[in-house]
């Protein structure tokens, strides 16, 4: 059991003097779980972390998804080391980027052409630009609660109803930009249709997380994505899948392969980098040929396609091609789900658990979670207490009630068994303090 965080606390105090908020991404702070110093990690191996105090954790954060093969996987580490020895950045084309592009195309047939960038945010941002260039329209649609990076156009909250335009969801986002975005509830065909009836002739594209990962793991209702394609295409707009979280997470071909629905454009990130910074986007040939140097939609990047990220991505996909890995993730996910639900029943703790294969979310509520409103209406205070109890048990989760638990190919049945026991102890403590 973890008993001290002395060095993490001291390091956070020092970080506050030099780094804004003491963290380089707000999701890493403990603000959403009652405050305190976030735990600073020193190294990772396989399914485990060790923090600066020497405490060991079973890791279900997986860096918010990218580390599907576990920390410091030897095949990926070797590829990165070799790339570094040969020079990490040239500013020229390389054989590695061609090889990696071919691998992505083979995995995801919707990608006629691809382009590499440096993050999921960049990938989504550029697909929007390309869609606007192709359609000659300006407005974008998105689903409430779905995160598509931190560019201005996607940091927009819903207006007062499905037929109203958005409002800025961050300081620094002009109202003029928010007016170009229509936000509708996920899994609700009627509100989507209502919005398209009013604004469809101005819409360039709709952004879709085909399986939601940003207010927990939420699957589309049967037929929902097919209806999205139908209605959006009838309006003359494009469908963009944000598969930054989902690609290569649930199966090798991404959510579009798992669900059997094809978008016009796809944004990728996270898993495809094997842990290094990366993004990519791609789609139909006639749409992608809008991108410079072939077309008028400009996008460039000094670090785009850098050899280290390309080598890491290739190695990661090579690991994921091994037979049985996704079946293992599903099996362990099912085992973890069953155990958590049994512990909740044993200790009379109200939860809803959403799981898809090797990813799940535990919500402190009895309600079904199918959209963002339902996810918001869950007990964040209870989650914060649970999070800190699990940290004391040596189990690392994301510090937010909205985030997923991600399994890696390196987790074992013994890890799952220990985690279930830890959940039981945490639930017992919560029950005692009701």
Swiss-Prot record:
Q: Which GO terms describe its molecular function?
A: glutamate-1-semialdehyde 2,1-aminomutase activity; pyridoxal phosphate binding; transaminase activity
Q: What is this protein called?
A: Glutamate-1-semialdehyde 2,1-aminomutase 1
So what family is this one in? Belongs to the class-III pyridoxal-phosphate-dependent aminotransferase family. HemL subfamily.
Which metal ions or organic cofactors does this protein require, according to UniProt?
Answer: pyridoxal 5'-phosphate
Where are the N6-(pyridoxal phosphate)lysine modifications? 270
Q: Please provide, in alphabetical order, the Gene Ontology terms of the cellular component aspect for this entry.
A: cytoplasm
Q: How does it assemble?
A: Homodimer.
Query: Which reaction is catalysed here?
Result: (S)-4-amino-5-oxopentanoate = 5-aminolevulinate
Q: Where is the signal peptide?
A: none
Q: Which UniProt keywords apply?
A: Cytoplasm, Isomerase, Porphyrin biosynthesis, Pyridoxal phosphate
The yes or no answer to whether the keyword Isomerase is present is yes
Query: What CDD domains has UniProt attached to this entry?
Result: OAT_like
The source organism is Bacillus anthracis
**Where does it primarily localize?**
cytoplasm
A GO BP term, please? protoporphyrinogen IX biosynthetic process
